Amino acid sequence: MTENPLGYEKISKLLKNFAVPSIVASLVGSIYNIVDQIFIGQGVGYLGNAATNVAYPFSTICLAIALLVGIGSASRVSLCLGRKEPKVAAKAAGNGIVLMGIFGIIYLLVGETFLSLLLKAFGATTDVFPYAKQYARITLIGMPFLIVTNGMSNLIRADGKPKYSMVCMVVGAIINTILDPIFIFVCDWGIAGGAWATVIGQIFSFILALRYLWRFQTIHFEKESFLLDIKESMKICSMGISSSSNQIAVTVIQIIQYNSLTYYGALTKYGADIPLAACGIVMKTNAIILAIVVGISQGTQPIIGFNYGARQYHRVREAYLLAVKWNLVVSTIAFIAFQFFPQSIISLFGNGDELYFEFAVLFMRTYLFMVLVNGVQLLSSSFFTAIGKSLRGALLALTRQTFFLIPLTLLLPLRFGIMGVLLAGPVADFSAFVLSVVLVGIELKKQKKLAYNLSHSI
């Protein structure tokens, strides 16, 4: 029996201890954008909502970078600890932290330099562009802090302290929520107020996350741990590529969707701006559900990674299947909300005319129709990453967005117009679900055989 609780504690208890704080922390990340959207929608109107939507790809790119290094280094740490290689684990964590800082600064400089060009590429219309530029120029300042915070949160969870990771994110979200109405309404800063509230909240989360450097328990840092090693950096990135590639694909599909909606929307009674605003609201609402799924997958990652490294395959299987059950409960609740209460949800994000609500309700009901199954692909991709099969995890992460959703979003509107953009979502969700079930089923059978051979060789 291994000394680490990950190797012997009851799986349901471990998942509760690791996943619940991860879910809260992940939810907080999505709440940053949603809170801004709600207050900006109330204070500026649907053009303000459209502006935050156009700027949203900056956040998804930021998350992709954080996942690349954060999940990658955390996965390396969990596997190395399971194999009883503490020095390698410390090196992986140290190199991961250094990479977070480097990538964060580079991202800020590139974003600010090409801001106008990028916003136009993201689908900003003439009316939306000035709002989007004002909002994005400010929020980009907080991106390096956000990358380090999100990346560190994965390492903190791998160290066995998911609650501290949660606190880091929650504190920033609370500050953001308090400052939003003050800056937007009291100070009358409009959309800029929402942006500054977000940045200040991110800085507070960053400070708390950085303080944990001196609190790691399973990882013992030395100066050499923070010396950038190319080979170790490549290993980190290879293990984080599946989670990161999924976010990159999310960014690509956002850009394609925004441009498709403005183009085909202009050919309908809704115009170009209404579909753009409605799309962002629906996506950010769905982001709450996806944040829960991401939290579950992040919570299972150290459990699966450690037990796979320790060759306790029955516990790997149990952890994955329990995570899927949790996801099904969340997805069922989401399906009921999206299908039966769409207008109530959309109303939270500000007022609009009849056409605005008509399209937004249609968008939510159609695009999110297969929400019941769309979390399985994320869980399965994370599963393969946790067991060190990063290439398979990366390919699976790309299935929904790259292999299904992007082609469908480009092709279906040619036949169905703007409805084609909406229909692409559920078709891609179901296709990715089927592929995930097949691939994970094959892997679990292999592990069952390994477990059998291991038990008979002792």
Spans of features found by a protein language model:
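Short runs within selected transmembrane alpha-helices of multi-pass transporters and secretion channels
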Residues: 70, 139-157, 165-173, 194-207, ...
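Small-residue-rich hydrophobic transmembrane alpha-helices
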Residues: 49-109, 146-165, 258, 278-342, ...
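Residue-level signal for short hydrophobic patches within transmembrane helices
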Residues: 12-31, 35, 58-65, 141, ...
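Helix-terminus/linker motif at the lipid-water interface of multi-pass membrane proteins
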Residues: 31-50, 119-126, 182-189, 251-282, ...
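Transmembrane helical elements of multi-pass membrane transporters/channels
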Residues: 17-36, 138, 149, 172, ...
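Hydrophobic transmembrane alpha-helices of multi-pass small-molecule transporters
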Residues: 61-64, 176-180, 206-210, 288, ...
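Transmembrane alpha-helix boundary and packing residues in multipass membrane permease domains
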Residues: 22, 26, 38, 75, ...
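Short alpha-helical transmembrane segments in multi-pass integral membrane proteins
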Residues: 1-19, 77-142, 186-241, 304-370, ...
